[in-house]
UniProtKB/Swiss-Prot annotation:
Quaternary structure note: Monomer.
Keyword hit for Transcription: no
Binding annotation for Zn(2+) 1: 56, 58, 114, 133
InterPro entries with a match to the protein in the record: Clx_II_MBL, Glyoxalase_II_hydrolase, HAGH_C, Hydroxyacylglutathione_Hdrlase, Metallo-B-lactamas, RibonucZ/Hydroxyglut_hydro
Keyword field: Hydrolase, Metal-binding, Zinc
Name of the coding gene: gloB
Protein name: Hydroxyacylglutathione hydrolase
Requisite cofactors: Zn(2+)
EC number, as in UniProt: 3.1.2.6
One Pfam family per UniProt: HAGH_C
Enzyme class at the top of the EC tree: hydrolase
Length: 255
């Protein structure tokens, strides 16, 4: 049975994600920008939290961990490489490790770039991937610690997941990301359609997260740095893929 997903808005533009196994009653949360909205979502559904999964150490993803742990007794799991700057971990994780939510098994994927210790969680039976600030709707995270090459390789890992995977990223950034993408390829029919869809969703107050990986592969410029059409659009026809990615990231940082 697939996990039930609840997207919980936090702060001004963050998301936490509750995942619930109806068969066992077990519930986990991925990232905790603040505890209040997560506790409210749990109470509304009568769910008990047993596990907190963390993608990376930034405060807008972990600030609510201690309050939530104190209120629920949930254990906390995060990257072993970042244990020294995450809230105290009950379980340290690395590439290929498995986490469980009830009967569902998720795999840890190391995705350095935004931070050097960033990880993602892929639950194949539910077609869910929790990517934090690595792969995002129409974008990717800024390179605060890692290199462009590292982030490009991380994005390639994520783009190799099944295309039906739902990408649960950590922020509501799609509208800005889409406007930027349109500056690179203003005449792309697929991009025009997606920009319009995102704008309509936000006008109606609907989240753009999660997004389909197939849509990201088709329209997210940060996943398409190896495509000839995008290389031509940025004037880097003969450049290496990671160099094109770095240029797109540089332009987005100034957008």
């Amino acid at each position: 049975m697939p996990l039930e997903l609840v997207t919980v808005p936090c702060l001004s533009d963050n998301y936490a994600f509750l995942v619930h196994d109806a068969g066992t009653g077990e519930t986990s949360v991925v990232d905790v920008p603040e505890a209040g909205p997560v506790l409210k979502a749990l109470e509304e559904r009568g769910w008990h939290l047993s596990q907190i999964l963390l993608t990376h150490h930034h405060s807008d993803h972990v600030a609510g961990v201690e309050e939530l742990r104190a209120a629920t007794g949930a254990r906390v799991a995060g990257a072993a490489a970042d244990a020294h700057r995450l809230p105290p971990l009950d379980l340290e994780l690395a590439e290929g490790d498995l986490v469980r939510v009830g009967a569902s098994e998720g795999r840890v994927i190391e995705v350095p770039g935004h931070t050097v210790g960033h990880i993602a969680f892929h639950f194949p039976d539910s077609s869910l991937a929790f990517t934090g600030d690595s792969l995002m709707a129409m974008g990717c995270g800024r390179l605060f610690e890692g290199t462009a090459e590292a982030m490009w390789q991380s994005l390639r890992k994520l783009s190799a997941l099944p295309p039906e995977t739902m990408i649960c990223s950590g922020h509501e950034y799609a509208a800005s990301n889409a406007r930027f993408a349109a500056t690179l390829e203003p005449d792309s029919p697929m991009l025009i359609f997606r920009v319009g869809s995102i704008a309509a969703a936000r006008k109606e107050g609907r989240p753009t997260v999660p997004s389909h990986l197939s849509d990201e592969i088709a329209t997210n410029p940060f996943l398409r740095a190896g495509e000839a059409s995008l290389k031509a659009a940025v004037g880097m026809v003969d450049a290496e893929d990671a160099e094109v990615f770095a240029e797109i990231r540089r332009r987005k940082d100034k957008f």
